[in-house]
Amino acid sequence: MMWLKDTQPAPGSRLSEAALARRFGVSNTAIREFLIGLSRVGFIRKEPQRSWILEGFTEQYALELHEVRRMFECRAIRAIFDIPEDEPFWGKLLRLRQEHIQLRSEIDTRFTEFSELDTRFHRTLNAAAGNRFMDGFQDSISVIFHFHYRWSKKNQVGRNGFAVQEHLEIIDAILRQDQGAATAALERHLETAHQTFIASLQRD
C-alpha cells in the first residue's frame, strides 16, 4: 500500500504480479491476494491472461464507496459501547488520542504522517465490530482515500489538520460514553472525506 501511495501510478497503469513480487521479495500468491482485495472495491481490474489495470474513479464510485464505508463504520461505533472497560481497546484509544493531539500541534511540519495515523484510527474503530471482512475493507479504503494523485496538494496541511480534529471529536465522544455524539461526529467525518474525494474527481 505504501508503494502505491508513494509512486502514484496514473489510471490505466498496468501492474504485474511477477514484477511486484520481485520488488517486495514475496510470492506471486501474496501479491495476487492483495490485488484481488483491491479489485473487490473496484480499485483495479484483471484483464484475462494479462496484467492488472489501475482503474479511474467516478462520482458514482465515490458515492457507493461512501455508503458502504458509512454502513461498516457506524456499526463499529455501536459495537464499541459494548466493549468491557478492562479490554485493551481502551488503552489503544487513549494512545491514539495522544498521537492525534501531538500531530495536531505539529501539523505544519508533520502533515504527511496523517495517512498512517488515519489508517490506524479507522482500523481500531472497525476492529470493535469483530468482522474479518471489515479489516480487509479498511486496507482498500486506506489506499483509495490517501492515493495522492487523486488528492490536491493545495491546502493539504489544513485538510489533514481538520481531519485530525474530527478524529479527536469522535474519540472524545467515545471516551465520555456518548454514543449519539460519537455517531454524529463519525458521520460528519465520513461526509467530509466523501466531499473531498468528490472535489478531487471534479478537478481532474
Mark where each language-model region is.
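Short linear motifs at protein or domain termini
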Residues: 1-82, 199-204
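Short, flexible turn/loop "capping" segments at secondary-structure junctions
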Residues: 13, 46, 118, 162-164
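Alpha-helix N-cap/N′ positions at the starts of helices
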Residues: 49, 72, 95, 162-165
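Solvent-exposed loop and edge beta-strand segments that line ligand/cofactor-binding
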Residues: 155-159
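Short arginine-rich
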Residues: 191-201
